[in-house]
Structure formats: C-alpha cells, structure tokens
Amino acid sequence: MTSESTLPPVVPPLHSPKSPVWPTFPFHREGSRIWERGGGIAPRDLPSPLPTKRTRTYSATARASAGPVFKGVCKQFSRSQGHGFITPENGSEDIFVHVSDIEGEYVPVEGDEVTYKICPIPPKNQKFQAVEVVLTQLAPHTPHETWSGQVVGS
C-alpha cells in the first residue's frame, strides 16, 4: 500500500473583492505633466488648485463681451480663496470677482483701480459678477504681487 492521502485537496473559500475596485497607478496625470505619487514633491511644484479660466457658455461670454465697461476700485481680494469684491464707481452694491476673470500679471489689492464688464451669476442670474477685469491703476505705496509670486513695489 502507498501512503497517499484519500482526503480531497483543501480549497480556500471564495471572497468577492472589496467594492468598488480601483486600479492603483503609481502616478496621475495633471494637464500635460505627470506627478509621481509619494515622490516627495516640493509644494512649489504642485499644480495650482485655482483654475486659470472659467468655462462659460458662448452666449454668456458673448453677452459679457458686448456689454459696457464699468470702472471701480478693488475693495478686497484673497488670492488664497480665489475671489474678492469690487466697489463700483457709481456707488452701487459691491460686485463679486473670481480669480479666473482677472486679466494681467498682478494680483489685485485694496485700492487698485479697475475696469470690468458684468455677467449674471448662474443659476438664478439675479446677481452679477465682474468679468474681463483689468487693473488700470495700481494702488500707490502698496506692494503688489505677480501671479508667479514675485513682489513688486513698496
């Protein structure tokens, strides 16, 4: 007689995978740059969380571009929050401005003179926001920062 086992082979129980199953990749794509995970990226190399331009429907963009140009003064702007407010020259209610609607190389600061057009804020379109904002006169004796982080003036 041989010493072969007559017991059936041990089969591990079946387990369903945890749901949902996400493939793990060592990197993810951000625009045209590839960022390695866990590679010790310096904070200055990370992509900005702020969008560079907003996507609007053609009709909203066309209406804003065709509208009149208004003048005002920057009341407040927070680069970290990505928005601020403009006080219109005519003294009406302050108007919202988003970082993506600012033209030029400088971050607005309190007292900067600006020109802008207006666009309704969805979904109700009852309030307006400033678009195509251009700094026409920088506030005197105030340091200004460029979008790249360089401080200019004092």
Swiss-Prot record:
UniProt-listed InterPro entries: Ca-reg_mRNA-binding_domain, CSD, CSD_CS, CSP_DNA-bd, NA-bd_OB-fold
Predominant cellular place of this UniProt entry's protein: nucleus
UniProt-listed Pfam families: CSD
Tagged with keyword Nucleus: yes
CSD domain location: 69-136
Keywords per UniProt: Cytoplasm, mRNA processing, Nucleus, Phosphoprotein, RNA-binding
Modified positions (Phosphoserine) in chain numbering: 19
One cellular component (GO) term of this entry: cytoplasm
Cellular localisation: Nucleus; Cytoplasm
Function: RNA-binding factor which binds specifically to the very 3'-UTR ends of both histone H1 and H3.3 mRNAs, encompassing the polyadenylation signal. Might play a central role in the negative regulation of histone variant synthesis in the developing brain.
Protein name: Cold shock domain-containing protein C2
Gene: Csdc2
